[in-house]
Structure formats: C-alpha cells, structure tokens
C-alpha cells in the first residue's frame, strides 16, 4: 500500500502525520472544546519507528483529508489578501474621485456662481443680491453605484 502512495507522491510519512494529527487535535479542541481531544499515537513515549510506519498505513485516508483541509484554508487565506487590496484600491479611487469632483465644483462656482463686479452692480440695481448658493449635491446628478462601476473598470 505504501508503494502506491509513494509512486503518486501522496504518501504521508510519520513526521508529517504527527504534525497533521496535532493540527487536527488543535482544530477539534477549538471547535468542540477541550473535553476529549484524543491522543496523537505518534506522541506516545514508547512508540517505535515500525509502529509509526504501521500507524501511517492505517491512518492514510484520514491524513489525506486533514492535508486537503489545510490546503483549502491556505487557498482561502490567499484570496483574503487579494480582496483586501481590491478594497484599498476602491477606497483610493473613491477618494480621488471625491477630490476631483470638489475641485470641479469650485471651478464651476468661480466661473458661473459669482458674477463679475460690473454685472453684480447691474443685478443689484434690478434685483436683490443673489442668496448664497448651496453646495451642489452630486448624488442627485450621479448614481454613486454607477460612478463606482466606472472607477472599478
């Protein structure tokens, strides 16, 4: 049986088996509590090398399951960092867009919001001076989700 695993590079030896069972025991204690965590047969004081090899043969299916669980967790952790980078990039783009929009708003206010002195005098004669303009709320003109989609592309 060991020859078949060795040919496929899937055979788990005593050292790795000991670590995998320690991981399984720690996971079990974390999820179910420390009442009955079980015993790692590789850590029994009087175990011989032949006994360890025998345990490896017997426990191969369970050891393979534990190894696959660990690999899945590593894959999920790798993706977590990727999502964090995406969130940071999205925040930077939103911040840059917000700054750009406030700059544009200030420019428009300077261009169209405050009349020149000559026009102001004429307007003052005809009507009351214009009231202070409210700051433009761009959410009314732009859909924030649409802007976010444009920025993320």
Swiss-Prot record:
Biased composition range(s): Basic residues = 82-97
Q: Which compartment or compartments is the protein found in?
A: Host nucleus, Host nucleolus; Host cytoplasm
* Binding partners and assembly: Homomultimer; when bound to the RRE. Multimeric assembly is essential for activity.
Is RNA-binding a UniProt keyword of this protein? yes
Q: What is this protein called?
A: Probable protein Rev
Gene behind this chain?
rev
Would you kindly state one Gene Ontology biological process term found in this protein's UniProt entry?
mRNA transport
Annotated Gene Ontology cellular components are: host cell cytoplasm; host cell nucleolus
Q: Which InterPro entries match?
A: Envelope_glycop_lentivirus
The source organism is: Feline immunodeficiency virus (strain San Diego) (FIV)
Single annotated GO MF = RNA binding
Domain comment, as recorded: The RNA-binding motif binds to the RRE, a stem-and-loop structure present in incompletely spliced viral pre-mRNAs. This region also contains the NLS which mediates nuclear localization. These overlapping functions prevent Rev bound to RRE from undesirable return to the nucleus. When Rev binds the RRE, the NLS becomes masked while the NES remains accessible.
Q: Where is this motif: Nuclear localization signal and RNA-binding (RRE)?
A: 84-95
Q: What does this protein do?
A: Escorts unspliced or incompletely spliced viral pre-mRNAs (late transcripts) out of the nucleus of infected cells. These pre-mRNAs carry a recognition sequence called Rev responsive element (RRE) located in the env gene, that is not present in fully spliced viral mRNAs (early transcripts). This function is essential since most viral proteins are translated from unspliced or partially spliced pre-mRNAs which cannot exit the nucleus by the pathway used by fully processed cellular mRNAs.
For the region Disordered, what residue ranges are annotated? 24-43, 78-97
Q: Cite the entry's keywords alphabetically.
A: Host cytoplasm, Host nucleus, mRNA transport, RNA-binding, Transport
